[in-house]
Amino acid sequence: MELEQLLNSVPEYAKDLKLNMGGVLRQTELTEQQAWGTAVACAIAARNPQLRESVLGEAAKHLNEQALFAAKAAASVMGMNNIFYRFRHLSTNPKYGAMPARLRMQVIAKHGSDPIDFELWCLAVSAMNGCGVCVDSHENVLREKGVSEEAVLAAIRIASTIHGLAAILDVEADPIA
């Protein structure tokens, strides 16, 4: 389903999310690649099949193959890392923090896309997944590389809007809810 068609199916009570989606993808703080890569990574992380397929379909018009690969890779590796590092952060046992991760994360260095864009996508997914350690880490890297706080927040607007839309689409797809 086309993204516009999917957004038009959003119920009236979630109209703000529908309208926000149109706006957050056109924020001037982000390049087109940054915005659509963020949308792809977050739509994958949101785990709603309709939203994921609609965003991927539209994003293919705005991203080259390498950027699309990198956005998918960001969602993939953050899906793993956010759980691992959030556990280490939340656990009161200090031994876990000293133990090695022993998880492959080579795609972080070998995604083939713009490193700042990839970092931004990782940040957005980390925010969705609630990993404070990862959010701080990615935000610090972005700020050190000169990315503005406005651009960081623009990516988070995309993440929050996609997260909200996924929740509504899940509810509307389940007649029991």
Curated annotation (Swiss-Prot):
Alphabetized UniProt keyword annotations: Antioxidant, Disulfide bond, Oxidoreductase, Peroxidase, Redox-active center
Reactions the enzyme catalyzes: N(6)-[(R)-dihydrolipoyl]-L-lysyl-[lipoyl-carrier protein] + a hydroperoxide = N(6)-[(R)-lipoyl]-L-lysyl-[lipoyl-carrier protein] + an alcohol + H2O
EC number: 1.11.1.28
GO biological process terms, semicolon-separated: cell redox homeostasis; response to oxidative stress
Listed NCBIfam families: ahpD, ahpD_dom
Top-rank taxon, per record: Bacteria
Gene that encodes it: ahpD
GO MF annotation terms: alkyl hydroperoxide reductase activity; disulfide oxidoreductase activity; hydroperoxide reductase activity; peroxiredoxin activity
Tagged with keyword Lyase: no
Keyword Isomerase carried by entry: no
Disulfide bonding pattern of the chain: 131-134
Catalytic class of the enzyme: oxidoreductase
Function text: Antioxidant protein with alkyl hydroperoxidase activity. Required for the reduction of the AhpC active site cysteine residues and for the regeneration of the AhpC enzyme activity.
Name this protein carries in UniProt: Alkyl hydroperoxide reductase AhpD
